[in-house]
Every structure is written in C-alpha cells, then in structure tokens.
Amino acid sequence: MQKRKNKGRFGDEASQRQLRVSELIKRNIAKILIDSNFYDQDRKIYSASVTEVRCSADLKIATVYVLPLDNIDAQDLTAFLGKNKNAIRYALGKEVSLKYLPDLRFKEDTHFLNK
C-alpha cells in the first residue's frame, strides 16, 4: 500500500505539522478579521475571506491567501493587511499557543479566478 503524500495545490509536499499549524492559523485569522473592525484612514472597512495558509518548513513564515469581499481591490486589501500585520499577529498570539508565532505575509488568492 502506498503512503499518501500531503500535497498542496502548488505541488510541494507539506508535513502533518505544517498542515495542522496552517489550519490553526487560518481559522484564527479568519476569526480575527470577522471580530475586529479594520479601517483605513478614510474609515473604509476591509473585509476578506481567508482561503488558505501555507507555512514554511520551519514554521517561521506563514503566507496567508485572501480573497477580497465587497468589491474591494485585491491589491489595496493585501497592502492594507500587510500594513496591519503586526496588529493581526498580536491578536493571533493571544488566540494560539505556539513556540514561535510565524511572520505573516498576505497575498491575493488567484486560484479561484483562474477557473
């Protein structure tokens, strides 16, 4: 019987630990974005859907893939989330207990746009 490999949608293999930490971060960042009100200087509300989180092999970097909601420009959203990543990371640190909290990087999820 062949052992099943954990492949992400980009083809590279991820360990079970990476998958568990990615799902934990995904659920908690989505909760943070729902519970918190993130505004820019013009009081524009940014809402996003977290579609996937990919952790590096050493779990020090987490790439968060987001889709904008409410007709928001995706580049504006990722720039805004990148600018506020320390506040999001701080809130994430209160929710999860990991030895090292990964650095967050936000990217637009284009996987659904290509289909």
Predicted regions and their residues:
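Charge-rich, low-complexity N-terminal segments
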Residues: 1-61, 67-115
